[in-house]
Amino acid sequence: METSKEFEFRPAKETSRSKSPGGIVGRLSNFARNKARHSLSEKGSNSVGGSGGSGFDKPRKDLLKEFHKCKEAQDQRLDLSSIEITSIPSPIKELTQLTELFLYKNKLTCLPTEIGQLVNLKKLGLSENALSSLPDSLSSLESLETLDLRHNKLTEVPAVIYKITSLETLWLRYNRIVAVDEQIGNLQKLKMLDVRENKIRELPSAIGKLSSLVVCLVSYNHLTRVPEEIGECHALTQLDLQHNDLSELPYSIGKLTNLVRIGIRYNKIRCIPSELESCQQLEEFIVESNHLQLLPPNLLTMLPKIHTVNLSRNELTAFPAGGPQQFVPTVTINMEHNQISKIPIGIFSKATRLTKLNLKENELVSLPLDMGSWTSITELNLSTNQLKVLPEDIEKLVNLEILVLSNNQLKKLPNQIGNLKKLRELDLEENELETVPTEIGFLQHLTKLWVQSNKIVTLPRSIGNLCSLQDLRLGENNLTAIPEEIGHLDSLKSLYLNDNSSLHNLPFELALCQSLEIMSIENSPLSQIPPEITAGGPSLVIQYLKMQGPYRGVVMTGQ
């Protein structure tokens, strides 16, 4: 079960075309997706790449034509994106009616000073160019609200930006910026600041003056500290600090009482300030990949809206102090890759909304006696622990759909496993199983059964009842035979039988698996089948079984 993506802090999605971010960011401004009716990229007759004329004269002529059309129609939006222009001619100054100008994905290295005469401009999109500076004339754009400079070559925030005090949304992601000046405090109307994926080492204290700031995205930089003044940004709902070099958070973080999401994954944080308990609007607590050994007592209990808890890849040796109450609102818990050796009895007794629990890669040796009370869970990952026994109460997890128990020390499965009627995926790789219970045949919705790298000698005939099974992995066991009932698996697409040193025969009924696309038989002797057939691969083996057995009239649609 893959969990890392599920628990990832995702304030915004990006594509190669630099679409505007989604979520709160998207609601602030979604202009990057809009296309104007005068976009040159949609007009073949005005294509800059057309033949005839010099490389400079042709685009200049086309742009002038577009400027004329725009002025004649008094259009307020002009899109000149993705046409490989390297410069903007000065007559653009005549388009004073423009409120939106898009110049995405071109080859601009500079802008003309005349752009400062577009005094009605509210949105200016310059993403995916080669800009290293901006003209001072942009300070005249007193109506400009949104400025997108993602994917350029800026090494600093151009000084003129600090003079555009009307700005509400500022995108500077994917540049080479090393610092943000104290003058950022001039942007009193700024609601969204995106400086992700730069080389910034610290934020200025003046950031505390941004009283309107709602979203602050600073991930993938080199921050070593966050100024205490961040606590003055009372409007903040999203603060993304993930993938930096932070060793601590400021105590003032507790003043951000409107905070809904805080991303601090992949830092070097050793402790969380208890003041965070004042952020009672928080819905996600994601601190993956830090150096936490514990949390402040009752921290999660004081955060009543938390639905996602991700404490994975830290140095925890026990569950957070706070008892069952701390998980009342929680839907997803990920504590993968820690040093936890025990699940306290009753810890999930009030977690009636809990659907996903990941305790992979810990030091668990047993499961609590009240495991049967985890009835809301649909996905449970306990792989890479030291479990030797599954409690019979596992049958009470009636909503379980995915169960991952790989890389433990299990010697047998309880027969009650057959009562998990909703189970779709069962992963038992790398254990010490010698048998599979007959009751496995009751799992009518099972699509994936992985039991490779065990000590299994035989399979129950009931395996033929798994009508939904698509992926069956039996490699690296001690199998001596495969039951003929395997021929009933009409949905089976992949079958792994590799590295079974005592497996000499395959049932002719295998030829009835008409959906079979992949079969691995490497390092299994299969003396029943001629070497030249096995050398030809799975497809030839299936055809051989079909021709040699009693099913030679069956048409193999999967081959």
Swiss-Prot record:
| Sequence segments annotated as region (Disordered) | 1-55
Keywords (A to Z) from UniProt: Leucine-rich repeat, Repeat
Q: Where are the LRR repeats?
A: 74-95, 97-118, 120-141, 143-164, 166-187, 189-210, 212-233, 235-257, 258-279, 281-302, 305-326, 329-350, 353-374, 376-397, 399-420, 422-443, 445-466, 468-489, 491-513, 515-536
- Composition bias, Basic and acidic residues: 1-17
Q: Which GO terms describe its molecular function?
A: volume-sensitive anion channel activity
Q: Which SMART domains match?
A: LRR_BAC (SM00364), LRR_SD22 (SM00365), LRR_TYP (SM00369)
One Pfam match = LRR_14
UniProt keyword Repeat present? yes
Q: Which GO terms fall under biological process for this protein?
A: intracellular signal transduction
Regarding protein family, the annotation reads: Belongs to the SHOC2 family.
**What quaternary arrangement does the UniProt entry report?**
Interacts with let-60.
Q: Function of this protein?
A: Acts as a Ras effector and participates in MAPK pathway activation. Probably acts as a scaffolding protein in a protein phosphatase complex that specifically dephosphorylates Raf kinase and stimulates Raf activity at specialized signaling complexes upon Ras activation. Required for vulval development. Involved in fluid homeostasis. Plays a role in nicotinic acetylcholine receptor (nAChR)-mediated sensitivity to nicotine.
Indicate what this protein is called per its UniProt record. Answer: Leucine-rich repeat protein soc-2
